[in-house]
Amino acid sequence: MKMIIGRKLGMTRVFVGDKVVPVTVIKAGPCFVVQKKTIETDGYNAVQLGFEEAKKVNKPMEGVFKKAGVNPLKVLKEFRVEDPDKFEVGQEIKVDIFSEGDKIDITGWSKGRGFAGAMKRWGFRGGPKSHGAKFHRELGSVGQHSEPARIFKGKKMPGQYGNERVTILNSEIVKIDVENNLIAVKGGVPGARGGLVLIKSAKRG
């Protein structure tokens, strides 16, 4: 499986033949393999990648990077793989592992919108806007009184909105700029500009 870590730069458009295609530009890599995990030692197979050089790290992490033979890195993310032996600790992973036309799964973190009410968070209709109503943007009924005398788990209520992990499946790579470590992906990608994204080859592609 191919995978890399990147940052969303923003959206633009490119011409493919006679069509205009909206794309999201991602600065992907270079990443380094910091650690390998196997079923024998950890109970599962995975590879840990590091991205972006860090100015300062604590002593334990300094030892981890020294053991891997790489400079201290800011972002560490783990990817499940079937065969970790295909990777070497300290190996550099660049954007050239992908090709134009490849299908990929992209994971990002949606924009955080803070504490939001039910109308904004869930699209509730709200109450009447006039004629003596005092029920404008309220939630409405959340359950019964005496039985079960509690609110069921999962009830749509006000709370933290956004800042959730979101994965877009089967996105298509439209263009790759190997020199500048850039990928142009068809359509939108979750998160704000500068947000972290995890890219891996499509599972269902």
From Swiss-Prot:
A single cellular component GO annotation: cytosolic large ribosomal subunit
InterPro entries per UniProt: Ribosomal_uL3, Ribosomal_uL3_bac/org-type, Ribosomal_uL3_CS, Transl_B-barrel_sf
Record Gene3D superfamilies: 3.30.160.810, Translation factors (2.40.30.10)
Superkingdom as given in the UniProt entry: Bacteria
Keyword Magnesium annotated: no
Listed GO biological process terms: translation
Gene Ontology molecular function, alphabetical: rRNA binding; structural constituent of ribosome
Keywords associated with the record: Ribonucleoprotein, Ribosomal protein, RNA-binding, rRNA-binding
Function: One of the primary rRNA binding proteins, it binds directly near the 3'-end of the 23S rRNA, where it nucleates assembly of the 50S subunit.
Stated family: Belongs to the universal ribosomal protein uL3 family.
Subunit structure: Part of the 50S ribosomal subunit. Forms a cluster with proteins L14 and L19.
Protein name, UniProt field: Large ribosomal subunit protein uL3
